[in-house]
Amino acid sequence: MKTLDEIKIQLESLKPVLKDKFQVETVGIFGSYSQGLQKHKSDVDILVTFSEPNDIDLLDFIALKQFLSRKLKIKVDLVEKHALKTRLKDRILKETIYV
C-alpha cells in the first residue's frame, strides 16, 4: 500500500508533465489518503484545476486519469475542482492536500 508521502513525492515529480501535456494548474489529494484512513485497496482521490479548462475534453480527462493511475500504480479517482458538487465542495476543499 502506498503512503500519502509516496504519492505526494510522485505527484511532485510529475508536475512538469502534468502542466505541459495536460494543462494541470494545481493538483491535490483528498479523501481517505488526506485523512489518513486509506485501506489496502483504497483508490487515491485527486483534485485538479486546469489552466485552460475549456480546452480539456472528456478524452483528455480520461487520458489524464489513466496516466496518473499508471504512474502512481494505484487506482485514481480524478475530480476537477469546478465540477465539485456544492454539498461536498467545502469538505473536500478543507481536506485537500496540495502538492
Task: Annotate the PLM regions.
Residues 1-26, 35-40, 51-99:
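Catalytic core of pol beta-like nucleotidyltransferases
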Residues 29:
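Hydrophobic alpha-helical positions that pack around
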Residues 47-49:
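Short hydrophobic/aromatic beta-strand micro-patches
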